[in-house]
Amino acid sequence: MASTLNRNLAKNRSLADLGALLHLVDPTLPIGGFNHSNGLETFVQQRIVESKATLEDYVQTQLLQNWIYNDGAYLSLSFNAMESHDFDRLCELDWELSATKVARESREGSFKLGVRLLKIFIRYENHPVLMAYQQAISEKCVQGYFPIVFAMIAQTMGLTKADTLYAFYYNAAVGVITNGVKLIPLSQMDGQDILFGLRQPLQQAVELSLNPNLDWLGSATLANDIRAMQHEQLYTRLYMS
């Protein structure tokens, strides 16, 4: 009897975690993520990313040579800080991440997404650190970058770090693929093929991000930073970054 009850409780908890995770990465969340390409639009206009193969290469490069040292790493560190209720450390990570985002549009896009995400979920998650962080944003002590807020909310929900990282990377990859399919353009099936091929790289990215090497924080693909800055001067644009 007791073992059956425990199994049912574990199952219900697992389903609750899944529901929370799906809500956190819901593409219909009103935060404006679909408005940002983070430099991809420049790559497409310059005919560097112009096919299914080049888009697939671009996504994998971003995942394994950029995100794991930047947004993914800061998400991982923020998750740790949230576990220990270390508000000061969360502020430090916000400042550090701000310094690594050299392209203005990408920098502003990230904290706008983070502020909107926090505004949604703080209504459901009554946590003192979340409230303190929102207050720090309103007082302009921190910016509220998306990966930091994402980690804080996920940890508050009781999600694991591995699940949080996978969801974050998956969400980012889907955004890039969706934008690439629209910009190049490609067929919807091409986009699905690219996404299917990311299953193993996504797992690899999670493994590499669980315990980030602090010496590699901020390491990035310079080409992407340059295109993200060039995006400000494009003659025609579909995206805000």
Where are these regions (language model features)?
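Charged, compositionally biased N-terminal leader segments and the immediate start
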Residues: M1-G19
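C-terminal auxiliary extensions adjacent to catalytic cores
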Residues: N171-S241
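Inter-helical turn/loop segments and adjacent helix faces that build the functional surface
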Residues: Q46-A53, Y124, P128-A132, T156-T164, ...
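Internal, conserved structured core segments that host functional sites
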Residues: G72-A73, L77, S84-A154
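Glycine/small-residue-rich interface belts in oligomeric ring/scaffold proteins
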Residues: D17-H85
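A contiguous pocket-lining binding segment that forms or flanks enzyme active sites
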Residues: E139-I184
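A short glycine/serine-rich beta->alpha loop
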Residues: L21-P30, V59-Q65, A99-S106, Q134-K140, ...
